[in-house]
Swiss-Prot record:
GO terms for molecular function: structural constituent of ribosome. Belongs to the eukaryotic ribosomal protein eS21 family. Keywords: Cytoplasm, Endoplasmic reticulum, Ribonucleoprotein, Ribosomal protein. The keyword Endoplasmic reticulum applies. InterPro entries: Ribosomal_eS21, Ribosomal_eS21_CS, Ribosomal_eS21_sf. One of its GO terms (cellular component) is rough endoplasmic reticulum. GO terms for biological process: cytoplasmic translation; endonucleolytic cleavage in ITS1 to separate SSU-rRNA from 5.8S rRNA and LSU-rRNA from tricistronic rRNA transcript (SSU-rRNA, 5.8S rRNA, LSU-rRNA); endonucleolytic cleavage to generate mature 3'-end of SSU-rRNA from (SSU-rRNA, 5.8S rRNA, LSU-rRNA). This is Small ribosomal subunit protein eS21. Component of the 40S small ribosomal subunit.
Length: 81
């Protein structure tokens, strides 16, 4: 919901799983959110930006979290294909 100034005023904004596009509920305590830093290709130093991925508990329970993160990192060109 937005107020008259156009600002979001909701108390809870649900996240979506980056791998399965499912909504991560408030009671999904097995879900994770991970930030992967972007580094400069020449110097190898952190350039101040990162990619955020959210993985729901169902993906983690199936043991697919590592494959999902690798697939997402490849599509964002963080990991070489």
């Amino acid at each position: 919901m937005q107020n008259d100034a156009g600002e979001f005023v909701d108390l809870y904004v649900p996240r979506k799983c980056s791998a399965s596009n499912r909504i991560i509920g408030a009671k999904d305590h097995a879900s994770i959110q991970i930030n992967i830093a972007e580094v400069d290709r020449v110097t190898g130093r952190f350039n101040g930006q990162f990619k955020t991925y959210a993985i729901c508990g169902a993906i983690r329970r199936m043991g697919e979290a590592d494959d999902s993160l690798l697939r997402l990192a490849k599509t964002d060109s963080i990991v070489a294909k």
